[in-house]
């Protein structure tokens, strides 16, 4: 405050009287965060570039770190209106105090008697699309039979959040898989209420999330699918790597994949066609979809369409495969008109055989996940490809080295090798795949480079590189070692097979 002096006219000789006038108190501004940034200069072990947070609304700040670190101990730099700042109630000297951002933290700005809170989220951005799934009530997914309702969001480019890059919808989700369902990192099946396009692929209601838990490279299925894409097989499932955030927690890197089913953009065999799976029947499953034939050890499952035991569709399918199986093992199976090629498509069987033999797919001896399709009026065709996470020598309970035949001993395939025409076709097609070795290696290298940040974040979540994971034969200790081992195995496999096929 200050004093002013009031005076009267000099004529009345009155003394001057001081008057107290209060100072004007400036209004305290509302505390406000202007910007929050992690500078690479302040965080050289974690960042290669500066990362600025996105202020959402008036209380949330979201970061996407462009590369992955083993921790999120970071020094922030802030521009703000206020006198002081705290992070999780710890006073912070912005630009010098390191804080742990592994979990959401509360940043509080104080100015006078006013405070303002911001919740800070630091996500590790790996370059992959990010998928959020929130089940109702955040209930755990515990069943492979019963779907749960959930909200769904898929952001293709989390850096720009461009309008066309975000898909939001409701979805139903359940568990899936056989041995993979028993793993710590679970695989899932997704079913939308209406057909949707995910990451540019043709619209459909049904999709799956493959966990790749047993495959530390996360490349085996993708590489086998690449072989399918360059083959004579009519359809190979399209897939993309994504990061899954399930019920608010990062759950690892998954392979979003088209579910195998009949459809115009999937297994295109028309309304009267069939999709079969030669597989070991799960104990307790209904008989309604299954039948057996004489020369296959496991049952044939009618995956699509829906059938009832003994109905017209079921009987047609059973008769079709039974007759084909019988003719394949008959005395006149080489007959050019009435022999096995009347019922089996030689091109698809040759390519399916070779892809599974080249990759040494443990499950493909007509025992597990062996798919076959039929279009009315046509022949039985092999495909689509499926289930390669323990292929490429990635098993400890079966032959795993790059030498030795494996799939050739599958019942139907072994019989087909008794036909010189099939042998000639296999040799011709093997030479084609052999000529594509450089393309295959480039594909592996490109995908490994694409996943270089994702695999570290996935490792931080699941800790598999230095531990035994069923049914791995080796523990290589790093992602680069895992990929290098796979490539060396595949090169050796190609060379061994070439030598053997050249002898035929």
Q: Could you describe each region identified by the protein language model?
A:
Residues 189-197, 204, 211-213, 232-237, ...:
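Internal "kinase-insert"/substrate-recognition segments embedded within catalytic cores
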